[in-house]
Amino acid sequence: MDDSQTPANPYAAGAAYVQGRFVPVGQASISVLDWGFTRSDVTYDVVHVTGDAFFRLDDHLDRFARSMAKRRLAPAEDRARMTEILHRVVSLAGLREAYVAMLALRGRPRIGGSRRPVDCDNHFIAYALPWIDVVPPEVQARGAHLWIGSGERVPDAAFDPTVKNYMWGDLNSSLMEAHDHGYDTSVLCDGQGRVTEGPGFNIFVVKDGRVLTPAHGSLQGITRRSVLELCEELGLPCAVADIPRATLEDADEVFLATTAGGVMPVSRVGPVAGGQRIMGNDRPGVVSVRLKELYWAKHRAGWYATPVRHDVMA
């Protein structure tokens, strides 16, 4: 019997691969001198598992490879080995529904005091946790309340937003601001007043029958891509475009998209003149619900599914 199937599975809370070993996620650690920690010199990606299968695993690995190349990160593990590790951490944890992360970190300098990135040994970490929803299911059911942060998103010219990263100072500030005002989560605009993204998700606006998602300042999300494909399948006009803040404030519907939760409807947006914008009778909108239902129905039918391999042992 595999460890993941025993009653006392030490990996039940999650499994990790770090420093070349598989360990319970609570035992995973890195050096406090790792530049991934001290300088956020790290890129990562997250893929989900549902029904014992990865969703769009190859697409996530492709994006992870692009991010590593842009950040000049080259861990020892090649793509084939990384794939094996991802399967193994899910299997060890015994999870059929999981949040699975892969990280490439700069590492610590081999030469004490060096400030040269090339003096660091890059390394790879992966872990699997029980399913995570960025927006809790009960909040999705009534529609999330979305706060437009008072700060600005880091400009594209300062850091490429298509590289998934942990430099979340601006996003976390907006999230705390949202919570201070009684909202569930937040989104930021850029210096030109265009809508960008939120902490861990892309945003979509439905206006006059068109489904729009920002062209700038945001990650090219895999769930975002999936939603655009679903719009085409349903015959819904959709576009990647600049979205002024005013369009968000006057939207017919708004929803969020992320690996950790899928399609997540919004029912309120604020602050706007007069307080807040309440959409769809303060409930998830018709288009949002239609896309959410189709997204999960296609999951159940095996859409872009890669079954978890439980025979990977190393």
Segments the model singles out, each with a brief description of its role:
Residues 78-87, 97-112:
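Short, glycine/charge-rich beta-strand/loop segments that flank catalytic centers
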Residues 48, 92, 101-105, 135:
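Active-site microenvironments in enzyme catalytic cores
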Residues 91-98, 236:
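Short secondary-structure junctions
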Residues 1-76, 84-88, 113-314:
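Helix-start/capping segments and mature chain N-termini
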